[in-house]
């Protein structure tokens, strides 16, 4: 007779969960941040709000964003005037867009990741799909399974309405799946489309305006598995440890509510302060077991909620400016793509490390951290181990 302990041992992988491929995708419509205030106030019929436009222009100028990608074009917005009004009932129109576009954009990223992985898609055993853009049944995970032609018995996990911390959540879940299911290959997809949050400006709800200045559309996909097949699968990063915590006294700091007018966005002014106040504790918990206390000696992948968060984290930890370079580069080129952002930064870092002739995928360093920040205020922490290039 075989014991339960023996069965469990046989079911578990030997090595740590490893990122084996990364793919990203964006809608073709590229928006320049410098001219966006003009476009935004014109398309929402708000050009008479001169002072508010000046405020929005300052928000865009301070955002450290040069460009973003958006599914919503001028043509689509003209066809859907209710989406352009502030808080006009428009959920049906928004849903009709995102239930199609979210899985479609996710597929584009997934196809790239599967191609880099180099294995047949029939070897995918699990699918994690994450989006804050719309809700449907069967979900975006089901739609993606159909679009990619995955096997019907792939084990699916659908994560809706998590927000900006969820790039860390999907990694945490993928790690547990890969390490506890020998031979598992997990396709992870985060796909975010701002059609649910776009709306005209309001004098009384400036935090909504912050969202209009920051958010962009994008999808990122990973293949995650333990014990890579030699000569076939090429490791990029290993995931060594994960955690999730709710920051104390942070209720209401970041909220989103699905209403007839779409997904509304609410933000307290002191979000950067709450994040920077709690980051030290998260780092100690993560890196004390590794005897690491110099946070300039690790590589950094932080969700770029906005430049103020990055500035305060740098200041609090006395980080050198180059530590956040990959994060700031992605923010500059794409804006805040919610859950997909940190996965874009992973991709940016491994590519830049190779281009610069560095020894590892993590800017030549061995250890690194990935942070997700979002509603709650929830903080996700992932300790990464780089791979030799």
From Swiss-Prot:
- The protein's superkingdom reads Eukaryota
Q: In which pathway does it act?
A: Secondary metabolite biosynthesis; flavonoid biosynthesis
What would be an example GO MF term here? Answer: naringenin-chalcone synthase activity
Q: Which residues form the active site?
A: 164
As recorded in UniProt, its EC number(s) are: 2.3.1.74
Q: Which Pfam families match?
A: Chal_sti_synt_C (PF02797), Chal_sti_synt_N (PF00195)
| Transmembrane segments annotated in the record for this chain | none
Which catalytic reaction applies to this protein?
(E)-4-coumaroyl-CoA + 3 malonyl-CoA + 3 H(+) = 2',4,4',6'-tetrahydroxychalcone + 3 CO2 + 4 CoA
What family is this protein classified in?
A: Belongs to the thiolase-like superfamily. Chalcone/stilbene synthases family.
The identity of this protein, by name, is Chalcone synthase 1
Recorded source organism is: Trifolium subterraneum
């Amino acid at each position: 007779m075989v014991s339960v302990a023996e069965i469990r041992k046989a079911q578990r992988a030997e090595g740590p969960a490893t990122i084996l491929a990364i793919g990203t995708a964006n809608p073709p419509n590229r928006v320049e941040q410098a001219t966006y205030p003009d476009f935004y106030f014109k398309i929402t019929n708000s050009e008479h709000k001169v002072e508010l436009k000046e405020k929005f222009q300052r928000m865009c100028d301070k955002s450290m964003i040069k460009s973003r990608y958006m599914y919503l074009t001028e043509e689509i917005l003209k066809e859907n005037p209710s989406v352009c009004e502030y808080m006009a009932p428009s959920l049906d129109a928004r849903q009709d867009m995102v239930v199609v576009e979210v899985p479609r954009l996710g597929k584009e990223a997934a196809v790239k990741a599967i191609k880099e992985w180099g294995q047949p898609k029939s070897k995918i055993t699990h699918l994690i799909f994450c989006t804050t853009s719309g809700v449907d049944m069967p979900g975006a995970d089901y739609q993606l399974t159909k679009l990619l032609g995955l096997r019907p018995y792939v084990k699916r996990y659908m994560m809706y309405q998590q927000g900006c911390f969820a790039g860390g959540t999907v990694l945490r879940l993928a790690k547990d799946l890969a390490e506890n299911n020998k031979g598992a290959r997990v396709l992870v997809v985060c796909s975010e489309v701002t059609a649910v949050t776009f709306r005209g400006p309001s004098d009384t709800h400036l935090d909504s305006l912050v969202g209009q200045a920051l958010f962009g559309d994008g999808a990122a996909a990973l293949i995650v598995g333990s014990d890579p097949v030699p000569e076939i699968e090429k490791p990029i990063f290993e995931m060594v440890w994960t955690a999730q915590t709710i920051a104390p006294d942070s209720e209401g700091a970041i909220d989103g509510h699905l209403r007839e007018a779409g997904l509304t966005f609410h933000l307290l002014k002191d979000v950067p302060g709450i994040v920077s106040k709690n980051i030290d504790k998260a780092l100690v918990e993560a890196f004390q077991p590794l005897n690491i206390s110099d946070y300039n000696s690790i590589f950094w992948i932080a969700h770029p909620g906005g430049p103020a968060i990055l500035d305060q984290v740098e200041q609090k930890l006395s980080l050198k400016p180059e530590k956040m370079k990959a994060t700031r580069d992605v923010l500059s080129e794409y804006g805040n793509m919610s859950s997909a952002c940190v996965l874009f930064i992973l991709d940016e870092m491994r590519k830049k490390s190779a281009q610069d002739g560095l020894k590892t995928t993590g800017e030549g360093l061995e250890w690194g951290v990935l942070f997700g920040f979002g509603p709650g205020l929830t903080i996700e922490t992932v300790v990464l181990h780089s791979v030799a290039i």
